[in-house]
Amino acid sequence: MSIKYIASSKLPTPWGVFEMHGFEDSETGKEHVALTFGTLSPDAPILGRIHSECLTGDALFSLRCDCGFQLQTAMQNVAEEGQGFILYLRQEGRGIGLLNKIRAYELQDQGANTVEANERLGFEADMRKYDMIIPMMEKIGVAKVRLMTNNPRKVKAMQSFGLEVVERVPLQVGKNRYNEGYLKTKSTELGHMMSEHHFTDADTEAKKD
């Protein structure tokens, strides 16, 4: 395995102080991060999330996806739980990279959906891999997970690596007029387990504020 642990530090956030653990993939040069909160036990089911990098959603507040909403909600949920983890994986654009993601967005602006755009660029709908989580989970000492995700591929990935997914916790947030089609495509073509009636509508929440 090419993933190497590098260092840890405190990370103060609006939801509390997390511990940030840095990892480096010597084969790809990519740097991944595990955030932990509270005391984690290998014997207890721990609330957590596998989150793939989304610069546009996580840092630039894009409404084209639900990624930023999911990350913030997951961190808040972990803090409220008193313990948990977030694995932040550098797999921008479902694995195609930032510039190709912008190219895909350009095609989406012309009418393609998120899957069609990737395929027109010569990529699979989802290029992500999850084998890097094995040493990351070993480092933070978690073996049983209550996984916050709508994506069955993440559940299967954890199970295939010998981790026990005790519960799948839906994370359905961030629906708005800009990403309705994107969310529908994730459900119908990528198999994400989502029910429209259980979404928090970001537009509605903004109006409440």
Curated annotation (Swiss-Prot):
<feature type="binding site">
    <location>
        <position position="65"/>
    </location>
    <ligand>
        <name>Zn(2+)</name>
    </ligand>
</feature>
<comment type="similarity">
    <text>Belongs to the GTP cyclohydrolase II family.</text>
</comment>
<protein>
    <recommendedName>
        <fullName>GTP cyclohydrolase-2</fullName>
        <ecNumber>3.5.4.25</ecNumber>
    </recommendedName>
</protein>
<dbReference type="GO" id="GO:0008270">
    <property type="term" value="F:zinc ion binding"/>
</dbReference>
<comment type="pathway">
    <text>Cofactor biosynthesis; riboflavin biosynthesis; 5-amino-6-(D-ribitylamino)uracil from GTP: step 1/4.</text>
</comment>
<dbReference type="Pfam" id="PF00925">
    <property type="entry name" value="GTP_cyclohydro2"/>
</dbReference>
<dbReference type="GO" id="GO:0003935">
    <property type="term" value="F:GTP cyclohydrolase II activity"/>
</dbReference>
<comment type="function">
    <text>Catalyzes the conversion of GTP to 2,5-diamino-6-ribosylamino-4(3H)-pyrimidinone 5'-phosphate (DARP), formate and pyrophosphate.</text>
</comment>
<dbReference type="InterPro" id="IPR032677">
    <property type="entry name" value="GTP_cyclohydro_II"/>
</dbReference>
<dbReference type="GO" id="GO:0005829">
    <property type="term" value="C:cytosol"/>
</dbReference>
<dbReference type="GO" id="GO:0005525">
    <property type="term" value="F:GTP binding"/>
</dbReference>
<dbReference type="InterPro" id="IPR000926">
    <property type="entry name" value="RibA"/>
</dbReference>
<feature type="binding site">
    <location>
        <begin position="49"/>
        <end position="53"/>
    </location>
    <ligand>
        <name>GTP</name>
    </ligand>
</feature>
<dbReference type="InterPro" id="IPR036144">
    <property type="entry name" value="RibA-like_sf"/>
</dbReference>
<keyword id="KW-0547">Nucleotide-binding</keyword>
<feature type="binding site">
    <location>
        <position position="149"/>
    </location>
    <ligand>
        <name>GTP</name>
    </ligand>
</feature>
<keyword id="KW-0862">Zinc</keyword>
<feature type="binding site">
    <location>
        <position position="70"/>
    </location>
    <ligand>
        <name>GTP</name>
    </ligand>
</feature>
<keyword id="KW-0479">Metal-binding</keyword>
<feature type="binding site">
    <location>
        <position position="54"/>
    </location>
    <ligand>
        <name>Zn(2+)</name>
    </ligand>
</feature>
<feature type="active site" description="Nucleophile">
    <location>
        <position position="128"/>
    </location>
</feature>
<feature type="binding site">
    <location>
        <position position="154"/>
    </location>
    <ligand>
        <name>GTP</name>
    </ligand>
</feature>
<dbReference type="GO" id="GO:0009231">
    <property type="term" value="P:riboflavin biosynthetic process"/>
</dbReference>
<feature type="binding site">
    <location>
        <position position="114"/>
    </location>
    <ligand>
        <name>GTP</name>
    </ligand>
</feature>
<keyword id="KW-0378">Hydrolase</keyword>
<feature type="binding site">
    <location>
        <begin position="92"/>
        <end position="94"/>
    </location>
    <ligand>
        <name>GTP</name>
    </ligand>
</feature>
<feature type="binding site">
    <location>
        <position position="67"/>
    </location>
    <ligand>
        <name>Zn(2+)</name>
    </ligand>
</feature>
<keyword id="KW-0342">GTP-binding</keyword>
<feature type="active site" description="Proton acceptor">
    <location>
        <position position="126"/>
    </location>
</feature>
<keyword id="KW-0686">Riboflavin biosynthesis</keyword>
